[in-house]
């Protein structure tokens, strides 16, 4: 389980600090698929970097903490990352938590065969076992995830984009971590390959019983595979709840507009997009940051920021219209 406690994060720039995350507060439960959605530039990938504790300059934690609890050899362990303990969660990388980065098919080392890259991962985290043991385990695991064994002898450029993506996912899940983060795992892949990647992630999560966190701007991806989801806008979480409930009755005006923009089978009409774009985080508007684009905005929306509160059992949102 992971608990995100009122996290704010900023980017250091030559003109000053830019607050990229503002007071994000939620939890990721054991054995669930959790989605993080929103337009480009809303802070999804930045949030994932904070959760995975890969905050390198110019990104740094401004406030709050991230707590990770996981099982290790039958013992429940707890790690914390905050301003006093930077890098606290990094000790659990790959063993307890793993990360499939955006454009993952491009992260493989082009001058090493796939088997050598698996071995490097294995050597760093299973030092007591040799290369022969690694080969045996990798071959068995490739069979489990539906990858042919001959990919081990291949260089990355010899594989298709979809196959490279599968290899990276296989590496990220090879040590059976308790939590997996996937940042836009279907980007730049055709629709057929996208379906295969999502199916692979779902099957691995069901088999391992771990938590899977999916970041995607594609609401259709979240509808297909997530149990719960959070909607990000301008660095803040504006809605959170069970995925089925969010799609059936979205609470926040931004979520409503996102869902209305989705195409439907048999629909011959034009879909309605969301006018404008996310605000410049260097100079965000006062009050609710969505107010300039919201057709239901009231004067109070531009005067004070709404609090992220539980509106219904298990459902949270940040909107003045819901707090009346």
Residue ranges and their predicted role:
Residues 75-79, 242-324:
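Short catalytic/signature loops enriched in Gly
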Residues 155-159, 163:
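Conserved ABC ATPase signature
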Residues 185, 189-269:
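P-loop NTP-binding/switch modules centered on Walker-like glycine-rich loops
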Residues 174-178:
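A short, proline-enriched helix->beta-strand linker immediately N-terminal to the Walker B motif
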Residues 37-39:
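The feature captures the beta-strand-to-loop junction immediately N-terminal to the Walker
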């Amino acid at each position: 389980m992971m608990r995100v406690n009122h996290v704010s994060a900023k980017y250091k720039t030559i003109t000053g600090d830019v607050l990229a995350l503002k007071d994000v507060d939620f939890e990721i439960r054991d054995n669930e698929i959790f989605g993080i959605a929103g337009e480009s530039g809303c802070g999804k990938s930045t949030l994932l970097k904070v959760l995975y504790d890969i905050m390198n300059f110019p990104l740094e934690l401004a406030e709050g903490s991230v707590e990770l609890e996981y099982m290790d050899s039958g013992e429940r362990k707890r790690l914390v990352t905050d301003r006093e303990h930077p890098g606290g969660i990094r000790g659990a990388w790959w063993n307890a938590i793993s990360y499939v980065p955006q454009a993952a098919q491009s992260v493989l080392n082009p001058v090493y065969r796939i088997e050598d890259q698996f071995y490097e991962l294995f050597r760093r985290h299973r030092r007591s076992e040799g290369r022969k043991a690694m080969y045996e385990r990798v071959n068995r695991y490739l069979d489990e995830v539906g990858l042919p064994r001959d990919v081990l002898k291949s260089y990355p450029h010899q594989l298709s984009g979809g196959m490279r993506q599968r290899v990276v996912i296989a590496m990220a899940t090879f040590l059976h971590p308790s939590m997996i983060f996937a940042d836009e795992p279907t980007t730049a892949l055709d629709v057929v390959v996208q379906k295969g990647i999502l199916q692979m992630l779902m099957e691995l999560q069901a088999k391992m019983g771990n938590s899977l966190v999916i970041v995607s701007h594609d609401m259709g991806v979240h509808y297909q595979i997530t149990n719960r989801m959070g909607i990000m806008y301008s660095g803040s979480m504006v809605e959170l709840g069970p995925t089925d409930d969010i799609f059936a009755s979205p609470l926040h005006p931004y979520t409503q507009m996102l869902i209305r923009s989705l195409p439907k089978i048999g629909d011959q009409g034009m879909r309605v997009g969301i006018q404008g774009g996310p605000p410049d985080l260097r100079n965000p508007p006062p009050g609710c940051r969505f107010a300039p684009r919201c057709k239901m905005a009231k004067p109070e929306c531009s005067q004070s920021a709404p609090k992220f509160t539980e509106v219904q059992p298990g459902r949270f949102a940040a909107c003045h219209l819901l707090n009346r």
